Amino acid sequence: MNVTVMFLVLLLLTMPLTDGFNIRATNGGELFGPVQRDAGNVLDHGFQRRRECPPRCPTSHCNAGTC
């Protein structure tokens, strides 16, 4: 097995451990501290700062970023 294949296999095995979304979903992002948690909040709640509708909200019931 050459080095490239070994590297790709190692990358595939370690990807779930380094996935920020999975870490944030399981323990609130505490593993990487406040920076990771803030990045998650930007991803999750950016629509509220922009005063847009949340993805789960029907547009007819949306008002200033909240349902």
UniProtKB/Swiss-Prot annotation:
Membrane-spanning residues: none
Cellular component, GO, one term: extracellular region
Molecular function in Gene Ontology: toxin activity
Location(s) in or outside the cell: Secreted
Tissues of expression: Expressed by the venom duct.
Reported modifications of this chain: Contains 2 disulfide bonds.
Keyword Metal-binding in record: no
Keyword Cell wall biogenesis/degradation: no
UniProt KW keywords: Cleavage on pair of basic residues, Disulfide bond, Neurotoxin, Secreted, Signal, Toxin
Signal peptide positions on this chain: 1-20
Taxonomic superkingdom: Eukaryota
Propeptide: 21-48
Family membership: Belongs to the conotoxin L superfamily.
Described purpose of this protein according to its UniProt entry: Increases calcium current amplitude through Cav1.2/Cav1.3 channels in rat pancreatic beta-cells, which is a prerequisite for eliciting insulin secretion. Stimulates insulin secretion in NIT-1 insulinoma cell lines. In vivo, significantly decreases mice blood glucose levels as of 45 minutes after treatment, similarly to insulin treatment. Has a potential therapeutic use in endocrinal pathologies such as early stages of type 2 diabetes where the pancreas's capability to produce insulin is still effective.
Entry comment, domain topic: The cysteine framework is XIV (C-C-C-C).
Name under which the protein is recorded: Conotoxin Cl14.2b
Naturally occurring in which organism (per UniProt): Californiconus californicus
